[in-house]
C-alpha cells in the first residue's frame, strides 16, 4: 500500500511533463515565430521593408532602386567612388522613384521628367553649355561655383541670391534651358561635370529649368539640384520643397 502513492506521484509528474512539452511546441520560439522582433529589413534590390516605415532612422536610398515609400530618406552626395562626411536628408512625398541615390518624378510621360540630385563635388563647368565651350574648374567655394554658372554664355543663369538650407548659408542660381537645342553639339545642354568618369555630365533637355541651392556644410560644398520641365513635370512644387527643406546629417555609410 505504501508504494501506491509514489506510483501516483510518478504518473502525475509524467502527465505534467507531457503537458508542458505540448505548450512548448506551440510557443513562438519553437515554431520559429519571433513576435517581439521586427521583420528583416529589405535588401537594396527589394527596397525598404514595411518595418522601415516604423523606424525612426531614415532609410538610405544609396543602393535602392524602385518606388520610394513616403517619409524621410537619406540621399548620398553623388560621388562616383568618392566619400563625403554628410548625407542630405529629405522628406519624400508619394509619387517618386529612385534609381539609387536620387529622387525622380514618377511621371509616365517622358517629357514630364523631373529629378532632385545632391552633388558633393563639381570638377568642371562648361563655359558654353550649348556650344563648343571650354571646361573650367569652378574653384572650391559656394560663390566660385555660383559665379561659374552665371558666367556661362550666353548668360543663361540668374543672379545668385542668398539662401539658407538646413541651417547652412549659400546661394541660389536658376538656369533656363532654351526650347530649341538644335545647335547644341550633343543635342543636350551640358552644365557641369563630376569627376573624370564615363558620362559625368549634368545635362538637361530642351525647355528645362535647373535650380541650384549651393551651400557650405561645415566646409563641404553641397549643390542641391532640381531639374523640371515647366508645365509638364508632374510634381515640380514637391521637388522644390524637398530641396528647400533638406537637412544635412552625418554620412551613415549605408
Residue ranges of predicted features:
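N-terminal targeting sequences that direct proteins away from the cytosol to non-cytosolic compartments
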Residues: 2-133, 204-209, 215-254
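Extracellular/mature segments of secreted proteins
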Residues: 31-32, 136-142, 191-194
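Short, basic/low-complexity N-terminal boundary segments at the transition from targeting/disordered tails
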Residues: 132-150
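Signature of long, low-cysteine stretches enriched in small and polar/charged residues
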Residues: 144-213
Amino acid at each position: 500500500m505504501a508504494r501506491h502513492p509514489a506510483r501516483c506521484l510518478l504518473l502525475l509528474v509524467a502527465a505534467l511533463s507531457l503537458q508542458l512539452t505540448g505548450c512548448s511546441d506551440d510557443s513562438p520560439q519553437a515554431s520559429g515565430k519571433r513576435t517581439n522582433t521586427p521583420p528583416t529589413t529589405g535588401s537594396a534590390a527589394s527596397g525598404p521593408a514595411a518595418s522601415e516605415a516604423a523606424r525612426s532612422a531614415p532609410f538610405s536610398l544609396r543602393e535602392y532602386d524602385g518606388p520610394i515609400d513616403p517619409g524621410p530618406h537619406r540621399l548620398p552626395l553623388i560621388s562616383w567612388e568618392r566619400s563625403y562626411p554628410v548625407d542630405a536628408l529629405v522628406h519624400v512625398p508619394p509619387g517618386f522613384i529612385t534609381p539609387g541615390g536620387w529622387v525622380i518624378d514618377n511621371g509616365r510621360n517622358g517629357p514630364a521628367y523631373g529629378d532632385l540630385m545632391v552633388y558633393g563635388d563639381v570638377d568642371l563647368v562648361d563655359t558654353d553649355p550649348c556650344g563648343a565651350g571650354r571646361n573650367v574648374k569652378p574653384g572650391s567655394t559656394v560663390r566660385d561655383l555660383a559665379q561659374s554658372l552665371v558666367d556661362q554664355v550666353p548668360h543663361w543663369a540668374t543672379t545668385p541670391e542668398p539662401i539658407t538650407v538646413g541651417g547652412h548659408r549659400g546661394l541660389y542660381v536658376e538656369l533656363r534651358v532654351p526650347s530649341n537645342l538644335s545647335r547644341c553639339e550633343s543635342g543636350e545642354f551640358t552644365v557641369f561635370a563630376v569627376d573624370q568618369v564615363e558620362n559625368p555630365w549634368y545635362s538637361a533637355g530642351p525647355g528645362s529649368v535647373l535650380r541650384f541651392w549651393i551651400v557650405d556644410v561645415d566646409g563641404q560644398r553641397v549643390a542641391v539640384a532640381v531639374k523640371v520641365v515647366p508645365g509638364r513635370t508632374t510634381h515640380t512644387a514637391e521637388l522644390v520643397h524637398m530641396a528647400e527643406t533638406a537637412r544635412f546629417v552625418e554620412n551613415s555609410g549605408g
